[in-house]
């Protein structure tokens, strides 16, 4: 199984990213949140899921393992295929989806185009208590809270700073750095992205 792909974004389509690796180009179907996270020529790391059915092979890409696990849980629900699962994750973030399931907020899920109340109820019955997320991104954000505060104190909007930090966390350059180098990289990368 292909667990992760490291590559450079060479094309962005309506619902997919094309990544150039050392040898191959891969097109990965991704959520709207994942798509919005990256720009052309960004070097990225995506978790993957290879969907196989009869003569159909599709490669899906995810920001982290939690988003991938949520996708896999969704396609385990009868009547939910990979496209519908991706539509869910394009309308609501994986952690918000888990919260909605835990809170029994069927109305929120039912509002997603193509889902409706009946399917939302089926999701709730199938998934309640089964969605576990590792909060990798959240724990990383907490670790660099002081950095976020220092950038906000420069006059930047907190929500935008938070969003740019999340983008930087998913860059290959960040994951390859020593811990001692990560804060300086994030500071420079976030400021660069804020000015674009």
From Swiss-Prot:
Keyword check for Cytoplasm: yes
Cellular component terms per the entry's GO annotation: cytoplasm; Holliday junction resolvase complex
Broad class of the protein's primary localization: cytoplasm
Record has Disulfide bond as a keyword: no
InterPro entries with a match to the protein in the record: DNA_helicase_Holl-junc_RuvA_I, Hlx-hairpin-Hlx_DNA-bd_motif, NA-bd_OB-fold, RuvA, RuvA_2-like
Region (Domain I): 1-63
S-S pairs: none
Alphabetized UniProt keyword annotations: Cytoplasm, DNA damage, DNA recombination, DNA repair, DNA-binding
Location of region: Domain II: 64-139
Region (Flexible linker): 139
GO biological process, one term: DNA repair
Assembly information from the UniProt record: Homotetramer. Forms an RuvA(8)-RuvB(12)-Holliday junction (HJ) complex. HJ DNA is sandwiched between 2 RuvA tetramers; dsDNA enters through RuvA and exits via RuvB. An RuvB hexamer assembles on each DNA strand where it exits the tetramer. Each RuvB hexamer is contacted by two RuvA subunits (via domain III) on 2 adjacent RuvB subunits; this complex drives branch migration. In the full resolvosome a probable DNA-RuvA(4)-RuvB(12)-RuvC(2) complex forms which resolves the HJ.
Purpose: The RuvA-RuvB-RuvC complex processes Holliday junction (HJ) DNA during genetic recombination and DNA repair, while the RuvA-RuvB complex plays an important role in the rescue of blocked DNA replication forks via replication fork reversal (RFR). RuvA specifically binds to HJ cruciform DNA, conferring on it an open structure. The RuvB hexamer acts as an ATP-dependent pump, pulling dsDNA into and through the RuvAB complex. HJ branch migration allows RuvC to scan DNA until it finds its consensus sequence, where it cleaves and resolves the cruciform DNA.
Family affiliation: Belongs to the RuvA family.
Name of the featured protein: Holliday junction branch migration complex subunit RuvA
